[in-house]
Amino acid sequence: MKNFKIYNINIKSIYKILLLIVAISIFGFFFLHLALYLMNHRNNLDIRNTSSNLASSEIRLPIVMYHSILKSRSGDYIVHPDTLENDFKYIQNKGYSTITMSELIDFVYNDSTLPEKPIIITFDDGNYNNLSYAVPLLHKYNMKAVISIVGSYTDTYTKSDEANPNYGYLRWKDISELMTDSCVEFQNHTYNLHSLKTGRKGCRKLSSESLETYTNMLTSDLTKLQNEFKENCNGYTPNTFTYPFGSISKESEQIIKDLGFKASLSCTSGVNTITKDPNCLYLLRRNNRVFGISSEQFFSKILE
């Protein structure tokens, strides 16, 4: 009887041990699969986050450059209103959304969002026909554009109060009214350096000019237009400088930055790659819209 009792106790102990082993195995199997699931889920999140970061930190940005919009004439810097409308249709059909320079700058500096396929439309010089033909089309297609004005042109037509789409330029009252329109943004195209008559091409430094003289000249000109914007447009200050003729000197960019401009526009063709580095906003490439070719012929080179 004594031996049987010991044997009975051993059987119970073995039974308990087996139950414990089974329980440990079940829980171990469960926790192993849970750990594997969590690791896999985390890896997937890392992959998605990496892709998202790459997408948000590197943006492909085409910029189109227009000047005058006219029905009566054609030329290298003149586009017919019908051509402009066809361009707008083509841009939208390709899935692109227009943005302003301020929205682009905000993306780089403040991590704001941009549409999936952004594009910037620019008009140089501030021709009055931009108001006559371009602005109604911007409204029609719910698009935005950047107009860079030459201050002396605007002052001249403000004084004469002449409004002629064939040869005139926007007056300050036109600009002030358009400032309240979300489809148009205004930028600085110099006060009086859009000329070849003085021996200086745009704002390029003369070979005989000292750095100090050049700095004072460019600072004075650009500041004059900045101040006129403040006076005529409720304190508004342009954040982007647009080079006349795309004429650039190696010294000019630092002066532009020192004056507080967050971006600059060149006339060099190509498509921009935008990152979170503020330096990518300077000397942005633009593509001049020439007359005589279809929207598809022009945009096939710069749109995906």
What are these regions (language model features)?
Residues 136-142, 168-188, 257, 274-277:
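Acidic (Asp/Glu)-rich catalytic clusters
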Residues 16-26:
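Sec-dependent N-terminal signal peptides
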Residues 146-148, 187, 264-265:
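Structural detector of well-ordered beta-strand residues that form the stable sheet scaffold
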Residues 125-136:
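Active-site-adjacent structural elements in enzyme catalytic domains
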Residues 152-155, 192-195, 247:
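Short, catalytically relevant binding-site loops at active-site mouths
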Residues 2-16, 29, 33-122, 129, ...:
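C-terminal active-site subregion of NodB/CE4 polysaccharide deacetylases
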Residues 64-69, 149-151, 188-193:
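Short loop/turn segments at strand-loop or loop-helix junctions that form parts
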Residues 142-165:
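A short, conserved beta-to-alpha structural element at the edge of catalytic cores
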